[in-house]
Design a protein with these regions (language model features):
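Residues forming the flavin
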Residues: 1-182
């Protein structure tokens, strides 16, 4: 999706984190970065759930890039910004630092094209009510989380999984990291 795999300037958040860690991306060399949320997530046919960590990861990376390079322009295309707990403060800080948030809906997803070594992201900006075009040095995609534990170990340890293959939590609000088995 969104040209992933066709250009080295289109990466996932996991790849961005690795590139920042091993210094293969220098934030000071970037002028414009676009981040797109809910890539292949919250769709009718695939990953029809919110992974609950993508927005936090996006905000963390956007703030890191902005602190490393205050002159960088960052746009975040999002469907719904889902931050939990203290991470909500990251959202507030990001807006205060000048990071631009552009909401999109399922029917009007951003479009991505490649031009030379840049990425062109077009979308509809609901506040101004018009299409926009952004020429970016880097496009970062927030992809959903997939369950990775095979069913056999879950059965062996007696841990229940939900219909999607994730461990079933004891109580999503108060005990989200506790399994049903005590």
């Amino acid at each position: 999706a969104y040209g992933y795999g066709k250009s080295p300037v289109i990466v996932t958040h996991k790849e961005l984190e690795e590139d920042l860690k091993n210094k293969s991306i220098d934030p000071s060399s970037l002028k414009v970065v676009v981040m797109i949320q809910c890539v292949d997530s919250r769709e009718k046919d695939q990953k029809n759930y919110c992974s609950r960590i993508c927005c936090s990861s996006t905000l963390k990376h956007a703030l890191h890039l902005k602190s490393s390079n205050p002159d960088i322009t960052i746009y975040i295309f999002y469907r719904d910004m889902m931050t939990y707990g203290f991470i909500e403060t990251y959202y507030t800080k990001a807006r205060q630092k000048g990071i631009t948030f552009i909401q999109y809906d399922f029917e009007n997803k951003p479009d991505v094209t490649l031009e030379d070594s840049n990425v062109i992201v077009t979308g509809f900006e609901p506040i101004i009510g018009a299409p926009i075009e952004i020429k970016a040095d880097l496009l970062v995609l927030a992809t959903g989380v997939l369950p990775s534990l095979p069913k056999d170990p879950a059965d062996y340890f007696g841990i229940q999984t939900d219909g999607l293959g994730f461990f079933e939590e004891a109580e999503s609000k108060w005990r989200p990291v506790d399994a049903l088995k005590e």
